[in-house]
Amino acid sequence: MYSQGYRFDIKKFQFVETGGIYIKAFPEEVHLYIDDEYINKTSFFTRDILVQNLLPENYNIRIEKDGYHFWKKNLEIESKKATEAKYIILFKENNNFDSIENNISAFYPNDNQIIFLNNLNELFLYRSSGINKILNSTQVPDNIENISFLSNENIIVKTSTGLYYLLDIENKKTKLIRSFNINTKNINNRNNKLVYQFNNSIYEIDPKEDSPKLLSRDKVNAFTVENNSIIALRKRNIVRIYDIIREEELLYSFENYNDNYDYQIVFIEKELFIIENNKNLYFLNRENNTFENKINSQEELKYTSFFNEILFYDNHNIWLMPLKRYESPFFKDAYSIINIKTFDRKVDDIKWLNGDYFVFTLDNELHISEIDNRDKLNIFSLNKNDTSNIFFNGNTKDLYILDDNNFLKTEKLIP
């Protein structure tokens, strides 16, 4: 019976079929412990371990390496199955942060370039090749609220007073967009032109000419741009808008519409969502072309995506929505909502590192978390306690943060 995978279970006082556990971890040479008993370690060439002939019950699994945070989880071993934990990354207990610049008030990233504003109200451009000043303090608009990279050509500077400027990096100058004011919202890029909403109508302008063109014949509640198409919500209808002359195309109905609510319509990883009052999430089920209510939050709902996964979060909750079914022990069906974690403290910002880990701030403290919600989440501190902005460059694997007015970059965090 032993050769057939059976062992005698003293607790049950009978022979049972055994199971196993398969782990795969980074970096190399990590040590595996099961119920505090050392089992084996990985090598430089083989980063996985398979342990067989375990009785079916729960075990405390621990992966550790000197100088790194350990990974620990209580996992169930089942008969005739190998429980998997194959997306384990151990993070250093002390990460090196390189200082890029000090006395920085904000930064605004876009792929491999970052614009940052210092405390003297000067604007700089950071690239891997170095730092260049774009504007001095007399050229920078007052009270900058946000800088958006709508395209390489269209970089929009928004002020808290409702003024908008077009930023020309190469020529180091700004131009006031006179068509925009404090009531302008939902600015999108389309073929290097700006599509925006003003008084519930949709307009398009070439920002270099600043001459608006009306696109929508009737009022809309919200709109978005996907593949250069304008998709709008008008009361209970989702329509495709072409221009003022061509007839609109009815796409879907939204039966939950309420005249007293505000709406956003967004595509996330090519899936269509409606966000109601910044709190309630609806998802378009393309099998029956109806909108399903997925999340009802008590606070402002935000999101960040990574290929076929979306993290939604508010001030205290994080949810995961997989957009396809994964062969993973902790994922459910595609388009389900998985409660990752509820916190007593405030979740400020989240950025994906890869499909299995994300970096986030909790009351401005910087952390990394896994998405494997079996047992307890493994959450690792990066020892920064005043982080107000984070950006992870997926191309270079560099993490940039603004911590206590210092613009910093970490060493490589993930393989």
For each predicted feature, which ranges?
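Hydrophobic beta-strand positions that form the internal "hydrophobic ladder"
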Residues: 114-115, 155, 194, 230-231, ...
